[in-house]
Amino acid sequence: SSLLRLQAAAITDAGVREIFRETENRIRSMALVHEKLYRSTNLARIDIADYLRSLADLLYRSSAITPEKVAIDVTGGDIYLEIDDAVPCGLIVNELLSNALKHAFPDDRAGRIDIRLAERDDGAISLTVQDDGVGLPAGFRMEAAGTLGLQLIQGLVQQIDGTIDVRRRNNGTEFGVVFHRKRGANAAAAHPDR
């Protein structure tokens, strides 16, 4: 990501520079998963709430928005994901947070973004990203979204065999993702209690 930052510094077009910044954030979100794994006592899984808090801090540092202007709160504990789920989950949250920070709070508007994680009774993981910003435009449909970020979200949700649903609120927007943990090669190590 440092190479992208160096390259972006030489670009004069603000739109192209923004594309480089978004790409750098995507790379950093993946690198952060690996950093959390290497620092943990279990190399097969990470505490996803802890990871998402670190990701929020990373996005603050790469934007002009401060925690005092837009608060980000991550709730949900004791949910551990192996890398096959953690990377796509992190990229989904990276895109949703980036979009909210960029579009939900125009004109120096203050607000908050809540990220909630929960394990449902059926064992599925529920991930909700909700903001109290200006909301989505009338007629917005996720499946018709033309931006790279929203297309990436849809592809990542498919990758984890999940579903996504978008709800317009009186104040803001709520994205809900539901998926089941992977039961791949690392499943036994990642979930010894199951």
Predicted segments with their positions:
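Glycine-rich nucleotide-binding loop
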Residues: 112, 135, 169-176
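Short beta-strand/loop element within the Bergerat-fold HATPase_c
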Residues: 110-123
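Histidine phosphotransfer helical core of two-component systems
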Residues: 1-28, 32-46, 50
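C-terminal end segment of the histidine kinase catalytic
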Residues: 172-194
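Conserved short strand/loop->alpha-helix "switch" segment adjacent to the catalytic nucleotide/phosphoryl-transfer site
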Residues: 12, 21, 43-46, 64-95, ...
